[in-house]
């Protein structure tokens, strides 16, 4: 039986707090993903010759993509620790920890010497800092997602939950604008010599802004209630896998295809356009920028519409579009025409939005309050490994071994079909669950 909330606030005050929460989750995730995307775009454009040069052009690019993917391997560890802390001590403390961790790692990458300066220590240090980024990212999203959704009115969970989601395309837009500006006003030699470091170092400024906003956000109502009832899980991870393993697996599979397709937009398309199609770097960055805007718009729409037609149906529409578009888009990309190249990416984001915007709300509704942070974070982290971790690397290997670009589309379509099946296994009735109170019946009732 659900217990009445002991932390209800007057409507006006709660509205003010909701606005503060939305700003905190949006700004924080935008900064986190700006840091992440700066690395992804650097991996596409400059890290191969600067840190992996002895491996040859193709080998260096593969190593660069591998350095992007390797951080995903520690995401589950970050998710486990963040989930434990978040379920026992609150969502807010995790949001601050992950923000600082990601920012510090990003700034230090901007200070790293290259292979030409310190030899093999350069890629070793790069990978260590990349692991630090991944560890922080493993806990960031779950905290932001839950803070937004657990503060939301029942009929607006999808909309509220879309705010941390649009931090992803917003971070991408910021990173792309930075890279575009540097690429436009610097020669290739200047960019390779020192220009690529600037966006990494700039993250220090963004972290200060994000910390200032997040420190004033109040803890979520349901966690406050659990504290009052002494209902926090003493061992959230054990409780999670004893009774909710199915939900964790479904959460991972639901996210896998969106993450894989998203990382093509984030990183691979820029490299593919410049290295394989001979497009100018500024052209591929323009395409990525416009794609980021499309991703933002359709993600917000996906969260909003999921409150009207349901989470599951919204996901099904998004993944259906990705399945149908994954192969044909390569015939537009391969024209090397900027307009068609950009159009291919924008159409892909029409599928990415509905399969990403409602994710915060869907995940929160899948898990009971006392293990919600652990379940959401670990499901997300595992989905990142299955989907996005090595998507650019797999895409490059498929291209090198088959010689046809649409083979990458087959890979994405198969993943999207798996995610479509997984989300179809989630009961539509979970959308009726009350996330503002600690519900003991929900705690004992898996999907």
Residue ranges and their predicted role:
Residues 88-100, 308-319:
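Cytoplasmic membrane-interface "Motif A"-like loop-to-helix N-cap segments
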Residues 43-77:
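Extracellular/periplasmic helix-loop-helix junction of adjacent transmembrane segments
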Residues 312-358:
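C-terminal transmembrane helical hairpin of 12-TM major facilitator-type secondary transporters
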Residues 40-41, 245-294, 388-391:
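Extracytoplasmic gate region of multi-pass secondary transporters
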Residues 159-183, 379-391:
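Glycine-rich segments within core transmembrane alpha-helices of 12-TM secondary carriers
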Residues 79-91, 299-311:
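Helix-to-loop junctions at the C-terminal end of transmembrane segments
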Residues 100-118, 320-335:
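C-terminal ends and interior cores of transmembrane alpha-helices
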Residues 210-217, 413-440:
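Multi-pass alpha-helical transporter architecture, strongest
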């Amino acid at each position: 039986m659900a217990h009445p909330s002991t932390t209800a606030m007057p409507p006006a005050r709660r509205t003010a707090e909701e606005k503060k929460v939305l700003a905190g989750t949006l700004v924080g995730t935008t900064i986190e993903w700006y840091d992440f995307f700066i690395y992804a775009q650097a991996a596409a454009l400059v890290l191969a010759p600067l840190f992996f040069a002895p491996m040859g052009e193709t080998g260096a690019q593969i190593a660069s993509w591998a350095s992007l993917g390797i951080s995903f391997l520690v995401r589950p560890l970050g998710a486990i620790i963040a989930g434990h802390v978040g379920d026992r001590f609150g969502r807010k403390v995790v949001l601050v920890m992950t923000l600082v961790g990601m920012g510090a790692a990003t700034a230090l990458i901007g200070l790293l010497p290259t292979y030409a300066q310190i030899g093999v220590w350069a890629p070793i240090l790069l990978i260590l800092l990349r692991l630090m980024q991944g560890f922080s990212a493993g806990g960031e999203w779950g905290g932001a997602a839950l803070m937004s959704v657990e503060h939301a009115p029942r009929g607006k969970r999808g909309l509220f939950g879309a705010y941390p989601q649009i931090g992803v395309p917003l971070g991408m837009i910021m990173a792309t604008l930075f890279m575009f500006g540097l690429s436009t006003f610097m020669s290739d030699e200047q960019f390779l010599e020192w220009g690529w470091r600037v966006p990494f170092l700039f993250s220090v400024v963004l972290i200060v802004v994000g910390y200032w906003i997040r420190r004033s956000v109040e803890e979520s109502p349901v966690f406050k209630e659990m504290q009052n009832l002494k209902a926090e899980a003493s061992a959230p991870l054990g409780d999670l896998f004893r009774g909710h393993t199915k939900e964790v697996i479904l959460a991972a599979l639901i996210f896998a295809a969106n993450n894989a397709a998203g990382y093509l937009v984030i990183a691979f398309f820029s490299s593919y356009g410049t290295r394989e199609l001979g497009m100018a770097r500024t052209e591929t960055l323009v395409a990525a920028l416009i794609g980021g805007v499309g991703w933002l718009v359709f993600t917000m729409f996906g969260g909003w519409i999921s409150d009207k037609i349901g989470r599951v149906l919204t996901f099904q529409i998004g993944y259906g579009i990705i399945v149908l578009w994954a192969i044909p888009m390569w015939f537009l990309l391969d024209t090397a025409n900027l307009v068609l190249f950009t159009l291919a990416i924008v159409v892909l984001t029409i599928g990415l939005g509905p399969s990403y915007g409602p994710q915060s709300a869907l995940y929160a509704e899948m898990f009971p309050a006392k293990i919600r942070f652990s379940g959401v974070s670990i499901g997300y982290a595992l989905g990142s490994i299955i989907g996005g971790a090595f998507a650019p690397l797999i895409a490059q290997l498929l291209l090198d071994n088959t010689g046809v670009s649409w083979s990458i589309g087959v890979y994405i379509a198969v993943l999207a079909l798996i995610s479509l099946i997984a989300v179809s296994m989630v009961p539509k009735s979970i959308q009726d669950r009350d996330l503002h109170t600690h519900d003991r019946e929900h705690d004992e009732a898996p999907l």
